């Protein structure tokens, strides 16, 4: 016999409890906000995280493509504009490129994605492919790692200027902007989730989807830890060159 469905309050509490597994607790991220990261590690994180940033609009476009509800689309499309920009607004991708320049990276090199590690690419691609194949409600719900995002952005704003004075302060605009954007996005995503998942089986399914998204974020940092902390990038026993694939256009 299946368990009774969680009440909306209980379900939201279960969702928020997943914050214990958010990547703010990953050793690589802890090193960054505790001031123990090297310049190379900060640069590696920014360059690799750029691949995530440029794919977020693709993920959101997939949700829109699968969603027949006009009101939902009208609200969700703001996420694409937040990242891609709009007339008179640079958008999050451009803000991230300014962060890259602020930590000493070359803009064109970041845009080329040549620094993106295979493990990061695989994790991000898995997320985008999930959004394309899942129902729009499932893909929308996977965004609820944003429940925990304001805390991680604030930790960077609080710690990085103190620990890394060599970073140009102009690069922090992305984190500042996401403080309010993430809270707005959470409100919408949470509303969709609490309304859609009404049975216990459906709620457990959604919690597993959220765990998948947490796995994506954690796996990205695992790949960066291997490359920049343990100094074991792909093929390190064979060559010091970046020989891994740079993405395949199909």
Swiss-Prot record:
Key words of the record: Oxidoreductase, PQQ biosynthesis
EC number: 1.3.3.11
A Pfam family this chain is assigned to: TENA_THI-4
InterPro entries: Haem_Oase-like_multi-hlx, PqqC, PqqC-like, Thiaminase-2/PQQC
GO molecular function: pyrroloquinoline-quinone synthase activity
Catalytically driven reaction(s): 6-(2-amino-2-carboxyethyl)-7,8-dioxo-1,2,3,4,7,8-hexahydroquinoline-2,4-dicarboxylate + 3 O2 = pyrroloquinoline quinone + 2 H2O2 + 2 H2O + H(+)
Keyword presence, Oxidoreductase: yes
Biochemical pathway: Cofactor biosynthesis; pyrroloquinoline quinone biosynthesis
The keyword Oxidoreductase is annotated on this UniProt entry: yes
Entry's Gene Ontology BP terms: pyrroloquinoline quinone biosynthetic process; sulfur compound metabolic process
Matches recorded under SUPFAM superfamilies: Heme oxygenase-like
Known function: Ring cyclization and eight-electron oxidation of 3a-(2-amino-2-carboxyethyl)-4,5-dioxo-4,5,6,7,8,9-hexahydroquinoline-7,9-dicarboxylic-acid to PQQ.
Family designation: Belongs to the PqqC family.
Protein name per UniProt: Pyrroloquinoline-quinone synthase
